[in-house]
Amino acid sequence: MNFHSTKPLSYDSSDNEIYNPFLVSTNEEGRVSPTIDKQQQPVLKRAKSIVSSNSLSAFFTDSKSKQQQQQQQRDRKRNKDRRNRPGRLRRSHSTNSNDQFIMNTGSFKLPDQDEFQFTMNNNSDNGFSSSTSSSDLESVPDLTDDNIDELTPETTPIKPVGNFYFNTLFDNEENTDGYYYKLNSQIKIRNELQQQQQQQQQQRLTSSSPSIFEIPEIVYKIISYVDEQNTILPQESTPIRRNPLSYKHALLIHGDKKSAQSALQKTTNQQSQQNQQPSSVISSSPLYNCLLVNKLFYKITSEIISTKFYSHNEQQLKKFIENKSHQQQNSSSPIIIQPKTFILHKLFQTKQIIFDQLIEFINFDQLSWFELYMCPKISLDKPQSQTFMKIFQSCSNNLTKLIITGSKTIDDEFLMKLGQFKCGDNLQILDLRACELITDFGIYQLSLYCRNLTFINFGRKPISNGNGNGGGNGGSGRYITDNSMIKLINNNRKLSTIGLAGCHITDKCVWEIANKLPNISRLSLNNCPKLTNSGINQIFTLTNTPNSNYFKCLSVLELRFNHQLTDLTSIIKFKRRQKFQFNIILLLELCESLMLKYRQQEFELDKLISLKIFQDISHWVNDYNDNDGDLSYNEIKHLINNNNNNNSSNNISTRGF
């Protein structure tokens, strides 16, 4: 066998110092030493042993490596289904020999060790003995790199040893070995994954849950509130008090000059505001902004807008008809709106042709409020057109409010058809003011079908008597009398508002109203020439009795232009009775002449009441014959004298003591 000899080391290896040929240090004696201090030395590599393949060392090394390979194969089979713990070093449990311990842990660095420390056998002395044989080099572990070109037979820099100690997720676990540690770690990882999945699901649910502005029912309520709060329909509002006819009239109503002037100024301002209010309100409606939010808002807002159709401008109405007709030509399906409210307000010049074109795009099945306010040229009962059939036959079950004022075509036949199509079954508000062709016959026919009316108005415009204040006895009001009104009152006991201005009713109708309608709150009897002074006084005198139930809820009474009324004392007492007994402030509407009579008679009544109060007080003070327990003047004088005598006698007796 051929052996490759090596040169002996140039220093004693028992000092356990590392030789670095590239650095030189000087001792105290001045000689050069190839050794350096451990704290200043760089990391060096240990020389790799070069062993011949024919040597005994190679033989033992090969056999030893084969045994290690076999042992590794057994370990792989044993740990095939097991997973090694990452980042932890397993210590060998075998402590039979120091060599095995050196084999398992000699190549690792502990935190409290130096850069490298040779492991000593038990059989060796205090240090490594220098030897020229290859067996000494075989005991040194191989710590060189795989790059053989950089190796030399002599010593080379040592490869730095890495620190294999680091923290893991389960450093706080007491059981860090074996099957239980693996099971606990798997359970913890599984729990963490489940928690992450739950959090992700919750995030998905929260992100996928719709907003309240994406729920159609809530959006519908929101837009409905916006519509109710901001949409002002073009209609005549009920005034709190009618406008004064003149400055003298305002002075009689309010009592002082400042109040009269402010009342006249308010009337002029209200008239100007009523003329400007509809256009400004309609153009600034917030519903048009709701159309621009999103598709859902647009759909619901357009549905709510289509439930109310109203117009007060003839030009806008014509544009609407043109747009609808153009859309109808471009689309295959008919474009029809279905409103619940239909109002045409003060369209004095609108003709029947425009109205017929308009109703072609409207379905009246859900109609509950139909109003034609001062549209005199529109007819609803024209024989050639089926206007009445299209409107009122389809909405007979839903119609609750019918207002047609100032029409020159509405007559008794129209009211008869309303009853025949059962439009009066649910009708509650009926306003037919200034419809000159309606007579007792039509009202009587309508009263046979209407049972739920709460508001009626058949008022007529008074004819001027030459003074400009009305009060004439002519006009169409003579066609409405007690014959129809008493029948209507008897069949509708829920009436609370009645307007009979200009009608030729008598005291009998007023008596039926007081006797049959306990809920009456507003009564308009302006310019009723058949009313008499004696009848009105008797009715209101009976209401002033203690046990009377007549007109208990009456809060508005209009008696303008009834110049035949001369005695208003019963009405004055009734007004005071409403205030003190029922806490109702009665609003009494009178014309200028009647208001003057009212103030004069009220002043005379106050004088009479004050005189009676003074007489009662004087009678109570000076009455001698009434045995009511009060002492007379002589008795009081006698008691005073007796009192004085007793006091003087007491003073004399005290002086004697």
Curated annotation (Swiss-Prot):
InterPro entries: Leu-rich_rpt_Cys-con_subtyp, LRR_dom_sf. Residues 121-135, 270-282 have a biased composition (Low complexity). GO terms for cellular component: cytoplasm; nucleus. It is found in: Cytoplasm; Nucleus. Disulfide bonds: none annotated. Residues 94-107 have a biased composition (Polar residues). The keyword Cell cycle applies. The keyword ATP-binding does not apply. Its main location: cytoplasm. Residues 57-140, 262-282 are annotated as: Disordered. One of its GO terms (biological process) is cell division. Keywords: Cell cycle, Cell division, Cytoplasm, Mitosis, Nucleus. Residues 75-93 have a biased composition (Basic residues). Negative regulator of the mitotic exit network (MEN), required for multiple cell cycle checkpoints. Required for daughter cell separation and chromosome stability. Involved in copper sensitivity. Belongs to the AMN1 family. This is Antagonist of mitotic exit network protein 1. It comes from Candida albicans (strain SC5314 / ATCC MYA-2876) (Yeast). The lineage of its organism: Eukaryota, Fungi, Dikarya, Ascomycota, Saccharomycotina. The gene is AMN1.
